Amino acid sequence: MVRHASISRTTKETDIQLQFVIDGEGKAELDTGVPFLTHMLDLFTKHGQFNLTVTAKGDTEVDDHHTTEDIGICLGQALREALGDKKGIKRYGNAFVPMDEALAQVIVDLSNRPHFEFRGEFPSEKVGTFDVELVHEFLWKLALEARMNLHVIVHYGRNTHHMIEAVFKALGRALDEATMIDPRVKGVPSTKGML
């Protein structure tokens, strides 16, 4: 069974088509209109061994906020839909990823209880033209729409690009672990009998 989902979202600010495959090959086809986000999603996809296709048109003449946020919404919805009833999944994932001088950690719980925590500080407000605060917006909307508990810790680093890159790689690896099917798990991984 292929775990996948397709999401379409059209507002006055953005028009997004997104396809997501959990059990993929690390292949990304991305046209986000936000070059730095495209780069980060490519890393996320490769290191999570997902397949991700995104076509997005947004009001980037204003800034990248709406497009970045709405892609986070769509990816979260796609992850939730692709997981289905979550039977047999590991549920939890944890990954440390270094990128040169930077070290990031991402912990996820596919619990159906949305929560987002972020610890760490980026030294720069921008990477190129990309507003660094949008990393938080993207991750929060992803967690909210996927209905997952997401904790992100940037332990240290000096280069903001490296730090964010480590976060997105760790996110891919943590979600890869959490979405894996564990043959020992019978039903849903919760003593409640549901997630």
From Swiss-Prot:
GO molecular function: imidazoleglycerol-phosphate dehydratase activity
Localization, UniProt: Cytoplasm
Primary localization class, coarse: cytoplasm
SUPFAM superfamilies assigned: Ribosomal protein S5 domain 2-like
EC number: 4.2.1.19
EC category: lyase
Gene Ontology biological-process entries: L-histidine biosynthetic process
Pfam families: IGPD
Keywords: Amino-acid biosynthesis, Cytoplasm, Histidine biosynthesis, Lyase
Pathway entry: Amino-acid biosynthesis; L-histidine biosynthesis; L-histidine from 5-phospho-alpha-D-ribose 1-diphosphate: step 6/9
Reaction catalysis annotation: D-erythro-1-(imidazol-4-yl)glycerol 3-phosphate = 3-(imidazol-4-yl)-2-oxopropyl phosphate + H2O
Coiled coil location: none
PROSITE patterns: IGP_DEHYDRATASE_1, IGP_DEHYDRATASE_2
GO cellular component, one term: cytoplasm
CDD domains: IGPD (cd07914)
Similarity-based family: Belongs to the imidazoleglycerol-phosphate dehydratase family.
UniProt protein name: Imidazoleglycerol-phosphate dehydratase
Organism of origin: Geobacillus sp. (strain WCH70)
Phylogenetic placement of the source organism: Bacteria, Bacillati, Bacillota, Bacilli, Bacillales
